Amino acid sequence: MKQIKSELMILGINPILILAFLVVVFTLIAIFAGEMLNLSLIGFEVIFPFIAAIFIGEWGKIKADDNYDMIAAQGKSLISWVLYRSVTVFATVTFFVVLCMAIVFHIRSEIPLQEMILIYLSPAFMLSTLTVLCNLIFTHEHVSTLVCGMIWLLAMLSKSMLRYPMTEYIYLFIRYSGDRNGIWLINKSVIIAICAVIWTGICLVYGKKNR
Amino acid sequence: MRKLLSVIYYEYVMQLKRIATWGVLAASVVITLLDGFPSEKNLARIEFLLQPSYFIYRSLSFGALIATFGLMFLLSNRMAIDHKTGMKQLIMASPITKLQYIFGKLLGGFIYTYTVFSLFLALNTLVFYVSVPIDIALTDCLVPFSKALIINVLPVSIFISFISVALPAIVDVRLFYVLASVLFILNAASPDSADKMPFYLITSGDLKKLIWQHPKFPYINTDGIQANLLFLIGCGLISAVPLFLRRKLWRND
């Protein structure tokens, strides 16, 4: 608890202000965007997962952190620091996302709130996991966000890849792309399973070393 | 003038020497070719792929957006990094004026973006020319390529370089990323259409239709082209204005 509190203090007020600003922007879009736009799908399956990744890349810095050497020298393992930092940032973003979902649901009622949470969690978890992985690899600032951003944009642009068999099981934005075969729950489970595998790898590699 | 040219030169060279620049260029070229390489399967799938102008048109919709996204990130810390590394104090101690510094950063970023974007198109066009299974005259590739360099690459480079250099020096870079990601997702989500496209599209707006037009819809939407051009150049230039107005950015002369 103490560590989470200190991570929240390090996080500061800026991310909270940016997230609050986003909630306001989404509320305005929900009111004025009209019925042609399915805001719940594009907002919570596509936009907010990448925003979660940006926040982890920018505020959950690991190797790019100015104090990395000092922190690494003090402990036997990096993993607890990585976990506390990443989970704190992810939870903060998710809190605001859920708030935004409630507002959008109240205004537009496009899809049920629980479903919005489900469609948000798996791409957000996947992109955030990749960002954490990049945070552990790259020492330069913004590189993690850049790498994840390119993956995110590529995934968005390559909807046509869904014509290949099995691709729809690992495609990040299955609901947004139409989900022709009704397999979105399986898709979300597969993506979360892949994330779990990556996290297991991170824990195994960084569990016993501090660099 | 010489001082301004020095700032532009160092800005340009420093950016070009970054490995990430070549990483972004390579990734966007590979991604574009994965989509539009003139292989047997792609030729069967994509109707007009044998036409060089269509290939360039398609490259502008697909890989170019990824390239501009990457370049935007690479340019976004150009002012902040001077502050962080202490270079700014060094520059401010030299007889460089605020105007020279800002223009140097902006123009250096612009020439860099224009170079990388041109290389992106040139590499794609070269691969297309070499591997297309029918005989195509070199001029058939060079004409749409040259048109794209002027009609598309120039305004897109002004937009990307100016907003990426200027805005993060005014607002938190993370807020800039968040706003930029919303703009890029709107770009990625907009389907290609023969009708008037939204004005806010970066690489795939109506300007692109001056390179290639669908034979069934051979008309040019002048309003759309003007709006797209105005958005790209206007936003780029307007975003630079607060830099000049911000007093904190420079010493008191």
Role assignments for model-derived ranges:
Chain A
Residues S144-R211:
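Terminal transmembrane helical anchor/hairpin motif
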Residues E115-E141, I194-T200:
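Hydrophobic alpha-helical transmembrane segments of polytopic membrane proteins
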Residues L28-S40:
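Short, hydrophobic transmembrane alpha-helix segments
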Residues S40-K63:
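Long, hydrophobic alpha-helical segments
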Residues L83-S109:
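Hydrophobic alpha-helical transmembrane segments that constitute the membrane-spanning cores
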Residues G57-F90:
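Helix-loop-helix units of permease transmembrane domains in multi-pass membrane transporters
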Residues M1-A20:
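Aromatic- and glycine-rich beta-strand/loop motifs that create alpha-glucan
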Residues V23-I31, T94-A102, G149-S160:
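Aromatic-anchored segments of alpha-helical transmembrane domains
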